[in-house]
Amino acid sequence: MTEGMCDDMVDGKYRGWADRVADTLAKASPNFSYVNLAIRGKLLNQVIDNQIPAAVPYISGPETLVSFHAGANDVLRPNYQAEIAFAKYEKGISDLSKTGATLIVFTVVDRVEGNGKTAQLWHERFSAFNVNVRDVAKKYGAIIIEADDAKWLADLRFLAKDRLHLNSDGHWRLSQAVLEKLGKDYDPNWKIPLAPAHKKTWFRKNSENLIWIITFVIPWIWRRIRGRSSGDGRSAKYETPISWK
């Protein structure tokens, strides 16, 4: 999410909510610098073992804002073990907390359309994931961005065609939610939901579902079978601090 997946592209990189937040923060601080170590598809152990150690040298106490959003990719795996993932998540926050940084974490939408087994499993896993995020945030004093406070997130029109990542409008709204939580300038229109969507015909809805399965679900399953990830071979957008204006 923090890489900016499925937002508009700028200079060959997804823009994303974090870049948008950086735009506002930089206006208030002439010495503002920005690092974005997020890489799509990474699991908790990869974030903890690789990204956190890479971030620590650039943290200088509470004036450094660090966002941590990891674990959702673990939840989506068939062999997901909640207790192991929860412990890893807390370790990540614990490691970052020791630096004195100001931490920000996120819950996720724990309900999706439908009443089948997939929707039920999604709710069971992600509702428990959210409870863990809240508990860890409280324990370590992290700022939490609550999906429950942003009902618009349940609207599929804010998701990209993969139905997993935010689209451009979704990233913009999330950036404004974060800025509001931080007490910075923000656009209150982020809270306004879209007008009710027109009801789709049975044919259109099922055609879109079929296209989605062919375009996104099958490739995802094929990567899992081969032990591959969409983030393999990719580097972070901004691995070292850059001046942001």
Describe each PLM feature range.
Residues M1-A38, I52-P62:
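Serine-esterase "nucleophile elbow" of acetyl-processing enzymes
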Residues A82-E90, W122-F129:
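Charged helix-capping and loop-helix junction motifs
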Residues T24-S29, G92-I104, N132-I144, K181:
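A structural motif corresponding to the C-terminal end of an alpha-helix
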Residues E113-A147, S168-H171:
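Substrate-gating cap/lid alpha-helix
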Residues K139, D162-H165, D169-K245:
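Conserved catalytic region of serine esterases and O-acyltransferases that act on ester linkages
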Residues S33-A38, T64-H69, L103-T107:
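Structural recognition of the beta-strand scaffold that forms the well-ordered cores
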Residues H69-N73, D95-S127, D148-A154:
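Active-site segments of SGNH/GDSL-like serine hydrolases
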Residues E3-M5, P30, N45-I84, D110-R111:
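Oxyanion-hole/transition-state-stabilizing segment in secreted/luminal serine hydrolases
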